[in-house]
Amino acid sequence: MASSDKQTSPKPPPSPSPLRNSKFCQSNMRILISGGAGFIGSHLVDKLMENEKNEVIVADNYFTGSKDNLKKWIGHPRFELIRHDVTEPLLIEVDQIYHLACPASPIFYKYNPVKTIKTNVIGTLNMLGLAKRVGARILLTSTSEVYGDPLIHPQPESYWGNVNPIGVRSCYDEGKRVAETLMFDYHRQHGIEIRIARIFNTYGPRMNIDDGRVVSNFIAQALRGEALTVQKPGTQTRSFCYVSDMVDGLMRLMEGDDTGPINIGNPGEFTMVELAETVKELINPSIEIKMVENTPDDPRQRKPDITKAKEVLGWEPKVKLREGLPLMEEDFRLRLGVHKN
């Protein structure tokens, strides 16, 4: 084998910066969450703030996130909120970086596809540059979308995917694939400590009400008394993970020894018609279910193989769909001003 083809072992991780050692040498763990004002990010903040030795810094541009998700922590001495776009460098001192920043809903990433891919590529480069400078460990929330419209079911981490590189979803799908590449290149070339989570469909309180994702769509429609709009043919499947389970998986990955990628998701699989019927039964039995045209490149099936998460992280989801939907319904009722009869 030619020398240029040989596998190169990763360099040892860089030492923390002199500034980190001199100014912040203390027992507290300083943790940055990019996109921390968003749905999953804000729940991650809540969990990390339970540990009194954690100082949590959130950087968010509020494109899809909201200060309301973090209002309980604003003014807390161990919490800091920075209005910042990750496509610009960020100069702070931290020990860990959870890199969540990126629009994850088709409505948002199709609205500004160039911004979406810049966030995935330039934003990830900036977060990796920060990790390199300060010697921080960095976790990327990648996505099940890297598998595209999968030809293998369920999807293990070893599957390379079936992605359309020029479709309307490509800014997100391919952007996350590039972000994963950058993570491993920085790991191999610079010794950065990396973790990659491939997260599957997640639901729960604080989801954007009109973000175009199927669970939030159905619950909002049911509460408004509107027909549930199921994209044809309705037999396409998804797997839904409750947000508390997702946060638990991300934290276990960050604190563990495996770089990933590791699938984090609930392997319970439902067709879109089954999901609509469940939401109808639980929230508003009087509404109709209406079939509408599908969007291009919509995957026919999606289900995580979580064997690796079980073996490496000791993680598997606990909350069943019928347990999680009422918790999300309660949050949506409050925000929509719809009272139970």
Swiss-Prot record:
Keyword set, alphabetical order: Cytoplasm, Decarboxylase, Lyase, NAD
Residues the record marks as active site: 172
Positions of the UniProt region annotated as Disordered: 1-21
Residues given in the record as substrate binding sites: 169, 201, 214-218, 231-238, 298-302
Gene Ontology cellular-component annotations: chloroplast; cytoplasm; cytosol
EC number annotated for this UniProt entry: 4.1.1.35
Origin: domain of life: Eukaryota
Location in or out of the cell: Cytoplasm
Pathway(s) of this molecule: Nucleotide-sugar biosynthesis; UDP-alpha-D-xylose biosynthesis; UDP-alpha-D-xylose from UDP-alpha-D-glucuronate: step 1/1
GO BP terms: D-xylose metabolic process; UDP-D-xylose biosynthetic process; xylan biosynthetic process
Pfam families: GDP_Man_Dehyd (PF16363)
Catalytic activities: UDP-alpha-D-glucuronate + H(+) = UDP-alpha-D-xylose + CO2
Binding site for NAD(+): 60-85, 172-176, 213
Cofactor dependence: NAD(+)
Main location: cytoplasm
GO molecular function, one term: UDP-glucuronate decarboxylase activity
Catalytic EC class: lyase
Gene3D superfamilies cross-referenced by the UniProt entry: NAD(P)-binding Rossmann-like Domain
Function: Catalyzes the NAD-dependent decarboxylation of UDP-glucuronic acid to UDP-xylose. Necessary for the biosynthesis of the core tetrasaccharide in glycosaminoglycan biosynthesis.
Family membership noted in the UniProt record: Belongs to the NAD(P)-dependent epimerase/dehydratase family. UDP-glucuronic acid decarboxylase subfamily.
Protein name per the record: UDP-glucuronic acid decarboxylase 5
Taxon lineage: Eukaryota, Viridiplantae, Streptophyta, Embryophyta, Tracheophyta
